[in-house]
């Protein structure tokens, strides 16, 4: 066997091991990760739970070393939140998965709103801040993200429970984003609001109704 063949085989084995490490305690189906990376699934037991109850974030304790996190990020398997923590792109594919990820980052007894709520509803690039409705103030960053607190009134009709979190409805989320955008953020905010309206089928009249019900939305 030549050196190049040996190196290729070692690289393939390492590539597969990295993917297996991500599946802590075999809670997630292996086939999804191997298909993402274009690999061939290993022969494993099919008796895996339907619901993944493992924590949605990966940390140092879940991986052999810090190099693994960077490697997984470069492979497109995980999204890094900071130098020590990340979440799986596989988990972020569903509404419940995104809510579970956000629940780990959000302070207790708070409501996800604005950009954070938009990510829960739509997915996409993870927001730079954790936007919440709360009466408390948080000065410490969480997983590399600043906690942005909005001390607003949120009627029961404007929030809903998604898995483990409470989040503003798509209509209220669009209003929060539109009423608080700046000239610098107007273009991306407009795109997000249009996506929310298209995905969840609400109209400008619905937004006007929300604004009438919450006079302190700004």
Q: Which residues does each predicted region cover?
A:
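Short gly/ser-rich loop at a beta-strand->alpha-helix junction or flexible surface loop bordering the NTP-binding
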Residues: 2-7, 18-19, 23-217
């Amino acid at each position: 066997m030549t050196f190049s063949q040996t190196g290729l085989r070692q690289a393939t084995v390492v590539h597969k091991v990295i993917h297996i490490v991500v599946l802590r305690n075999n809670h997630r189906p292996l086939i999804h990760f191997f298909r993402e990376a274009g690999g061939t699934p290993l022969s494993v037991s099919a008796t895996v739970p339907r619901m993944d109850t493992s924590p949605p974030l990966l940390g140092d304790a879940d991986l052999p070393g810090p190099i693994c996190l960077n490697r997984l990020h470069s492979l497109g398997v995980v999204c890094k939140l900071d130098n020590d923590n990340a979440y799986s792109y596989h988990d972020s594919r569903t509404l419940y998965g995104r809510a579970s990820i956000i629940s780990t980052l959000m302070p207790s007894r708070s409501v996800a709103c604005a950009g954070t709520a938009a990510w829960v509803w739509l997915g996409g690039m993870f927001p730079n801040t954790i936007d919440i409705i709360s009466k408390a103030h948080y000065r410490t960053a969480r997983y590399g993200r600043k906690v942005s607190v909005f001390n607003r009134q949120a009627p029961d009709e404007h929030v809903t429970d998604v898995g483990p979190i409470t989040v503003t409805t798509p209509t209220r989320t669009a209003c929060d984003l539109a009423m608080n955008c700046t000239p610098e953020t107007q273009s991306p905010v407009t795109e997000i609001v249009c996506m929310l309206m298209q995905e969840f089928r609400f109209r400008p009249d619905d937004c006007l109704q929300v604004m009438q019900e919450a006079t302190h939305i700004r």
